[in-house]
């Protein structure tokens, strides 16, 4: 255990920076962030006990410092004025001239693009391109519509069709699938007393006739003969017109007259009581 602790102390002491080294970052961004006051590269200095151990950086950084010193220097106030500008703000006295030009409606573009030569030496801010929009343009694009009527949403004038009477009106009211027997019963205007005519007579089993009304003694459409779909032994109960319908032959539509009376007695005796 003592040997492990001793080896750890030796490794920690050997890794200490006891020899002067040249510490340089991959780019000069860190040095620029630390030295924005005078705008030039300065050697990186530690704050603490390592200042007495590491001497000032010689050699390469001093050459870079000598090269940078020949360039024009910018103070911190100039950099702050650059950073504080917004796109819709115009510096110095150019804002007053632009406001007057916007009110007149015809701003002088030549004066905006080419500032006077006296201001170039006074301040470098005169090269900022102004983006202030004149008032006549702001009034044009000041409001935007919230809802726009599309071409297919515009109100259209509906022309009312002339009133039809008789057979033509009845044909317009009946849909195209009425001839197949799927439409609900509708009242014919030609039937007196407001009687309703079913599209398909399920009890009788006859196809509906083509409706036709006499016009001056002639038929508009020729009448078709009713087609009977009823079979002889269809097994359908047909109600009679008598007040007390008979329920003897409920499951059979009729009695075969060829059956002998003896066979009829046998079949009646086989029925359940």
From Swiss-Prot:
The keyword tRNA processing does not apply. Residues 1-15 form the signal peptide. Residues 263-273 have a biased composition (Basic and acidic residues). Keywords: Biomineralization, Cytoplasm, Glycoprotein, Nucleus, Secreted, Signal. It comes from the Eukaryota. Residues 125-127 are annotated as: Interaction with ARHGEF5. Residues 110-121 have a biased composition (Low complexity). Pfam families: ODAM. Glycans are attached at residues 114, 118, 159, 240-241, 247, 252, 258, 267. GO terms for cellular component: cell periphery; cytoplasm; cytosol; extracellular region; extracellular space; mitotic spindle; nucleoplasm; nucleus. Residues 100-124, 240-273 are annotated as: Disordered. It is found in: Secreted; Cytoplasm; Nucleus. Residues 240-252 have a biased composition (Polar residues). O-glycosylated. Highly expressed in tooth-associated epithelia. Predominantly expressed in mandible. GO terms for biological process: biomineral tissue development; inflammatory response; odontogenesis of dentin-containing tooth; positive regulation of epithelial cell proliferation involved in wound healing; positive regulation of gene expression; regulation of actin cytoskeleton organization; response to wounding. Belongs to the ODAM family. Interacts (via C-terminus) with ARHGEF5. Tooth-associated epithelia protein that probably plays a role in odontogenesis, the complex process that results in the initiation and generation of the tooth. May be incorporated in the enamel matrix at the end of mineralization process. Involved in the induction of RHOA activity via interaction with ARHGEF and expression of downstream factors such as ROCK. Plays a role in attachment of the junctional epithelium to the tooth surface. This is Odontogenic ameloblast-associated protein. It comes from Mus musculus. The lineage of its organism: Eukaryota, Metazoa, Chordata, Craniata, Vertebrata.
